[in-house]
Amino acid sequence: MRNRFIYKVKDFDKLISKLLVFGKSFKYSCLLHSNSSIKKLPKKYSNFKAIFAFDSISNISSNHHSFNKLKEFHKKEKDWLFGYLSYDLKNESYNLKSKINDNIKSDNMSFFIPKYVFLIKDKMLHIESFESKKVIDILYDEIINQCCLVDKNISIIFKSRESKEIYLEKIKKIKHHIQIGDIYEINYCQEFYNNNISVSTAELFYKLNKITESPFASFLNIDNISVICLSPERYLLKNINQIISQPIKGTSKRSSN
């Protein structure tokens, strides 16, 4: 069972910056940021201002029977899990195959059990770990004495996988299918990429989060993959026997009932 130790947070933003700097040295880390100090969300939808987990006690990755493996892993460990479920999991659940080139080469699913979990709520920091109070005090002091991230200009030029002409031609075809009733809605996406770039993903997340102030921001590092998310939407939240989804589309009230 994890121990929990509590510390007072003097400057929330500086703490987040220092945690991002500290987390650079670990292959496994995850920051979940609600930006609740900026945007007032209903308390029932936001339990913490931020959660930061890092270092790995154990981890699991899979490309076959992933849901069953994750279920068994969680059943065995019964602890915090941080990670991702990829889009290509659909190919495991249904007789489907992705035709688009995968330039990231990520697993269908990957999760880790962190050695340390930092829970920031109100003005208090709760640290969960199997370590002693003495060890955690040293760790806390090391983090507090970190330098903050430097806010500097980051210039990235992206390329599109499709030309403007091809993109507009596909949009024309999609509109035709909508007009004749084959479909009523579609999300059409294309990749924007840069294969030759050197940038600190921690600094990039910190800067973008300052701009977007998203209620469901996250920064995940698993092995050699970094994922930055600055989303206004939550896919799913499970709380005891209740499941909540918070999408943007289709949620506005249209009448009194």
PLM feature spans:
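Extended alpha-helical targeting/anchoring segments
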Residues: 1-257
